[in-house]
UniProtKB/Swiss-Prot annotation:
SUPFAM superfamilies: P-loop containing nucleoside triphosphate hydrolases (SSF52540). It is an enzyme of class 2 (transferase). It catalyses: dTMP + ATP = dTDP + ADP. One of its GO terms (biological process) is dTDP biosynthetic process. It comes from Escherichia fergusonii (strain ATCC 35469 / DSM 13698 / CCUG 18766 / IAM 14443 / JCM 21226 / LMG 7866 / NBRC 102419 / NCTC 12128 / CDC 0568-73). This is Thymidylate kinase. GO terms for molecular function: ATP binding; dTMP kinase activity.
Amino acid sequence: MRSNYIVIEGLEGAGKTTARNVVVETLEQLGIREMIFTREPGGTQLAEKLRSLVLDIKSVGDEVITEKAEVLMFYAARVQLVETVIKPALAKGTWVIGDRHDLSTQAYQGGGRGVDQTMLATLRDAVLGDFRPDLTLYLDVTPEVGLKRARARGELDRIEQESFDFFNRTRARYLELAAQDASIRTIDATQSLECVMADIRQTVTTWVKEQGA
């Protein structure tokens, strides 16, 4: 069966946009042309509104978004994107390149926020079932490096303004999950840009050839 859903994950400032460009270039060199791009949260009209609510520091004024409310908004945006965009594209044989997916919630909310892992797993199974990316590229970067890059881009969103401790917990959970799942490939994003790009090219090329896609 052809596998064609690739997701790019990582902390803020890990280089996901650059990685996406390298993935696209690599796939094109392998003769793959039909691709769409998604981001989470977002990617549909409803999901983009939810993105604004959950990430815009000013979206709800002084009201505090609770941890469970945050999780539910992320999943509402995700399931809308999966059901209305990603699954239909995959059914047509189109490749989908995603900026974040469920691993982000497991790492950020499960690791960073400390939300109960059993609750997250139950919710994920309820709304996504066995739907998973075929390949996830996790760009591993320390919070110190990643946030320095993110701050250089300009104003930070609500999540990006969290503490170093939050991002250290998030990174630790990412690494833990990556070690448990062979479909998640870890890329050392603290290397030079040239080395990171080379690692991504090699990883994607090898994986595609292994799939016979």
